[in-house]
Amino acid sequence: MEDQRPPLSWLDAFETWEPVLRLMLAGETERAAARPARVAGRISQYGWSLAHRGSLSATARTRVEDIQRALARGKVQEVAFRAEVRPDGRTTLGLVWPSPVVEPAVGYPDLGVLVLAEGSLPEPWLRRPDPAPEAVPAPSADPELLERTLRERLPDAVGATAEEIAAAEARLGVALSDELKALYRVARVDWRGDFEGADRVGDAVGCELSGLDDLYAVDAERRHSGWGHGAMRALSTAPDAAVQGLAGSPGWIGFGSNGGDEFAVDLNPGPGGHFGQVILVDHEQSLGAELVADSLTDFVLGRRREERGGRRGNTLPAVAKVGSGFLETIETAAHGALEVLSIGAWDGAPFSLAPLAGLPRLRTLTAAPGTLADPLEIAGFSGLEFLELGVRDWRVLLDARAVPRTLKAAAIKVRDQDHLPVAALANEILALWDRPQIAQTLIQGDLGPATTAR
């Protein structure tokens, strides 16, 4: 049957976008004041993000859905757009197409984050666990009691042999805790469609139990949600923390779930933890884990912690924000533990970055347009891996050949007047790392002159 969806080339016609642009321009006052109006948005196969308050008109909704069908037919995930509309109606529309070097991110309607180093991750996701050679099991850890309890609850279960457990240890590259071995000596878990058996074991253990062959180490890279979010995060391990501040660890051995979150036995606990404690890895979080039981014995016997802790979020001193409503000086934020600094909107004099010189852990810097006194001060920061600046500040760095080569990812913060040149500027940044260029289609059209309200 003939495909009735519009072809992808249909998106190159100005008329395709006219209903969407008119919707987004409704109520704008810029053109009536003899100034260009600018709009931006993003449409994907499964949704859209348009700077428009209220519901879509029937005409605009139909057109958006047609655009979605064209994207689906062309097997293109999404298209971002920006338009500049002059008072007389002449319009320049820029379409930005998906690129393998761009991570779409909230707050970046037309581009996203430029990935400069293939496969790179922010530092917290690369962090390895500190050795814990002195860690011992909790007093409540009792492999014999655990095994006896499970045999009483699961009298017909088939357990794993010593050889099978040893093979699992060899595959994982770690020695399992005595409690975890005791659990699998009772039930090796090989369902083969036996859902009732799975339910019985789940009830006995207290979670959806994975099979011995399915044990895994919680992988930090799998939890990475993208540079736009990850570059702004930091984790630390307090001196008395039970769980180390990590994204993942070879010593976090996932053995079950609650249907969404993961339960793991922790073989690399924090300074205040115990070897073999049970932690929860929240599927809605990309960093950290929470202590839920001091031992697997406690976990199975239902002696779980009511008050959980262990996650460290965006708290000073590792993460700081300067600007209106936050810290008012760079000096206040600058200290040896600082990793992430965001400079937001500010009505005062632009900031000097001199107080940041020499900070050993500074890896992320974001600055709203117009907030930096001298962008070239950035050239002296030797450890930056993520940088977000406005168009003019990037222009200064590019012209001076002073873009830090330590960067792994970057972003361009856009203000009204900077709309359409962003893709070209991004391509200049990408070229420094020999990365593929972003494709942009420029379309000219006419929406007619602005109407003056009476």
Whereabouts are the PLM-identified features?
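Compact, glycine/acidic-enriched structural inserts
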Residues: 279-309
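A surface-exposed partner-binding patch
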Residues: 51, 126-259, 369, 391-408, ...
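Conserved hydrophobic beta-strand positions in leucine-rich repeat
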Residues: 317-320, 339-344, 362-368, 387-389, ...
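Inter-repeat linker/turn residues at the boundaries of leucine-rich repeats
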Residues: 336, 357-360, 370, 379-382, ...
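An N-terminus-focused feature that recognizes amino-terminal "leader" regions
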Residues: 2-69
